[in-house]
Amino acid sequence: GVLGLAGSRVTVHGAEHAVGPAIFANNHSSNLDAFLTIWLTPRGTVGLAKKEIVRYPFYGQAWLLAGHPTVDRGNSEKARASMRALGDWVRDHGFSVCMLPEGTRSRTGRLLPFKKGIVHLAVQTGLPIVPMVTVGAVGSRDKGSFRIQTRDIHVHLLPPRDTPRG
């Protein structure tokens, strides 16, 4: 992938937990996290990103071409409606979802508070949550730069957590 071309090594731990349908929840420390998360999850996984991603060169076009949904974080009514529609679609089609539940990138690598959308989606769909932890990606791509820094990145997929269906 892109990270390999940049000289980065990605080591995956717990790959046996990459089974869907599920909600894959990864921490957010790099602009590459969404693509890394989707790459490591089973076929039939859609990602969810803020609507502004479409303005990012390369990322936005790739996101749209892949058919991944976006959410308007600035309008809570629209955000809730799009999350409900996503939940219905995922449940009806047997797909998985990958999310970065912090909702924004951590500049330090420290975990930020989670947004509520992941809980609502899990309860609506009844899908288990597979926690993912990416270590080493902080600073892999500086803001405003297209250059990917070489890193040793470790991604840990943890055992799924069942969620009650609402």
List the predicted regions and their residue ranges.
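Catalytic core of membrane glycerolipid acyltransferases/transacylases, capturing the structured
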Residues: 3-5, 20-76
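Short gly/ser/thr-rich secondary-structure transition/capping motifs
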Residues: 4-12, 80-81, 137-140
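A cross-family acyltransferase "interaction/gating" segment
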Residues: 17, 58-61, 95-98, 107-166
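Cofactor-binding loop segments of dinucleotide-utilizing enzymes, especially the Rossmann-like FAD-
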Residues: 50, 102, 134-135
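Anionic-ligand binding region
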Residues: 78-87
